[in-house]
């Protein structure tokens, strides 16, 4: 189906366009598309920046730009740097709501509403350019240009991956990924529109949301990533989605075999992995077999520098810096070239080590690297709920010993990490990548502070925080080496520092009153901390609770100068 045929067919469709908080038919969507397209044409808009949380609004804005001949620019996020980029590049900013921080015209979705559409309203389509940001391996944003015809061709290629048995059920397409990136754009937006499948409007970024939302529809497809799919556990109410999920599509990294097995057993039999990049589009897929299969339009060559690919969708040859081993029935990915390192004359694939440890029931996510200040390996590990329980029960040394032994079954001693850091979650971005600065800090800096999950000022004299105890707290070492708990003196240190951060305390308190430690504070505990200030009596009371259990409480007497200043 050409882009013109696709457009003509959808313009006549009576089917559902999107669903979620509210549903839209294709006819309703076409009315909004035509109205926005007319606005863009009337105002001679040549370049539009698009940033949306609502998938329906995004799709409408994209199609309106196609009709109006307006090129599209997709920021990966709304950082200050990207805001400046938009201001210097585009004529208008299209989003769910007006952004008053941008110094360019902004048009919210509420301004596009139109109630009627007829075939006579349909305009010619234009092969507009769509610009996406990608960080690649450097962490610095690059601009990648696609055009509308290429995006339609990508959708056509991808449609062949889904079995007819999946498509015939007309499943609703659910996504945990962002439409601001190539993966979300291709699969959530283009593929669903190409196949005429209804798209769920909201992004579902937690496993619980995917499960609950799946139950609301007869059949669904999940568009997700290993980052989220690796978090599924038996502790989730898996039964909610049973019988509702027709297929799971995953991209952005390798899906660990244990997670694939879990999905096959509890979610659905069709688990489809996609390999590619923003530059190349989708390159290969893997479904129910050990090896990857190239898409039909891909021509390729393998060298020591990686995998070079070219296609109708990527006419300039692109080098993917991944080590590849060809087999008779496909190929295997060994990981990025820069993630195959040499230690003591031994070639070691860091991805292979990660994949092996991902099989362990204690490991939810992992990143292994050569230590920034040494010649040995370091591992940054996010533990599963089971792993956290064992951490609290047995301690850090036992966890490391068990993971090393698990890895040693198939790896030489030189490949076993000597430096370990543990956490509850690795801070991956929407493309499943880690910021190199975060990795460096995690490996080199001791963990001494709590994680502030949320905070707000309730009133002028009451402040609330929700904090989490880090797994790998430096203060667990020594006296609390086996049974990890936060010493009382450290709890008080945190309280004073948090009061200083919210500007309630500058100097050291004069004294402490009515101090009580009632329950242990342990690794990964999430607690609420409430400060109440009495300026007349020159005191700040604090109470730390976990659910209904009191952990710590007391009062600080503050200097005269601070109570007067407040």
Q: Whereabouts are the PLM-identified features?
A:
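Conserved AMP-binding/adenylate-forming
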Residues: 38-78, 170-179
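Conserved pre-ATP/AMP-binding loop-to-beta segment of ANL
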Residues: 8-12, 110-133, 165-173
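Gly/Ser/Thr-rich phosphate-binding loop
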Residues: 235-290, 301
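Conserved AMP-binding/adenylate-forming core of the ANL superfamily
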Residues: 5, 13-42, 146-149
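Conserved C-terminal "lid"/linker of ANL adenylate-forming enzymes
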Residues: 341, 403-451, 562
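Conserved AMP-binding A3 loop
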Residues: 25, 129-156
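AMP-binding/adenylate-forming
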Residues: 89-98, 145-164, 168-231, 247, ...
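AMP-binding/adenylate-forming catalytic core of the ANL superfamily
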Residues: 320-415
């Amino acid at each position: 189906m050409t882009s013109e045929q696709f457009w003509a067919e959808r313009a006549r469709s009576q089917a559902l366009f999107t669903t979620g908080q509210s549903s839209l038919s294709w006819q309703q969507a076409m009315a909004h598309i035509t109205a926005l397209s007319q606005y863009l044409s009337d105002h001679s808009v040549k370049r539009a920046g698009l940033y949306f949380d609502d998938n329906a609004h995004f799709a409408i804005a994209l199609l309106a730009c196609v009709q109006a001949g307006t090129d599209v620019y997709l920021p990966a996020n709304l950082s200050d740097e990207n805001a400046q980029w938009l201001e210097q590049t585009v004529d208008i900013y299209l989003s769910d709501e007006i952004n008053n921080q941008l110094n360019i015209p902004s048009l919210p979705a509420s301004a596009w509403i139109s109630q009627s559409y007829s075939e006579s309203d349909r305009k010619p389509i234009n092969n507009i350019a769509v610009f996406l940001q990608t960080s690649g391996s450097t962490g610095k944003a690059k601009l990648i240009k696609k055009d509308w015809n290429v995006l339609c061709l990508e959708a056509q290629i991808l449609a062949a991956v889904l079995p007819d048995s999946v498509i015939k059920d007309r499943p609703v397409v659910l996504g945990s990924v962002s439409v601001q990136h190539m993966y979300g754009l291709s699969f959530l937006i283009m593929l669903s529109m190409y196949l005429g499948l209804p798209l769920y409007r909201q992004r579902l970024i937690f496993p619980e949301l995917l499960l609950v939302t799946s139950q609301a529809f007869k059949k669904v497809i999940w568009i997700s990533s290993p980052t989220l799919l690796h978090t599924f556990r038996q502790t989730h109410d898996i039964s909610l989605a049973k019988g509702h999920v027709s297929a799971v599509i995953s991209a952005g990294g390798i899906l660990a075999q244990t997670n694939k097995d879990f999905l096959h057993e509890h979610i659905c039999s069709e688990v489809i992995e996609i390999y590619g990049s923003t530059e190349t589009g989708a390159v290969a897929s893997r479904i129910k077999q050990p090896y990857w299969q190239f898409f039909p339009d891909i021509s390729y060559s393998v060298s020591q520098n990686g995998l070079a690919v070219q296609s109708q969708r990527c006419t300039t040859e692109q080098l993917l810096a991944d080590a590849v081993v060809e087999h008779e029935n496909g190929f295997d990915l060994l990981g990025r070239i820069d993630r195959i390192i040499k230690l003591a004359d031994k070639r070691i694939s860091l991805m292979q080590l990660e994949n092996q440890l991902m099989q362990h029931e204690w490991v939810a996510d992992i990143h292994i690297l050569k230590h920034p200040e040494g010649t040995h390996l370091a591992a940054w590990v996010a533990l599963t709920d089971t792993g956290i329980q064992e951490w609290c029960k047995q301690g850090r040394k036992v966890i490391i010993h068990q993971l090393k032994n698990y890895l040693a079954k198939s790896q030489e001693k030189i490949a076993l990490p000597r430096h370990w850091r543990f956490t509850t979650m690795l801070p991956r971005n929407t493309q499943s990548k880690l910021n190199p600065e975060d990795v460096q800090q995690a490996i080199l800096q001791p963990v001494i502070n709590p994680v502030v999950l949320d905070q707000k000022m309730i009133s002028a004299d009451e402040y609330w925080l929700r904090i989490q105890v880090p797994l790998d707290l430096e203060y667990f070492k020594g006296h609390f080496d086996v049974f990890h708990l936060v010493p009382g003196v450290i709890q008080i240190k945190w309280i004073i520092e948090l009061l200083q951060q919210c500007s309630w305390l500058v100097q050291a308190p004069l004294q402490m009153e009515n101090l009580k430690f009632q329950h242990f504070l342990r690794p990964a505990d999430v607690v609420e901390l409430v400060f109440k200030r009495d300026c007349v009596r020159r005191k700040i009371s604090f109470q730390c609770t976990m659910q209904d259990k009191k952990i710590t409480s007391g009062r600080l007497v503050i200097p005269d100068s601070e109570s007067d200043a407040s």
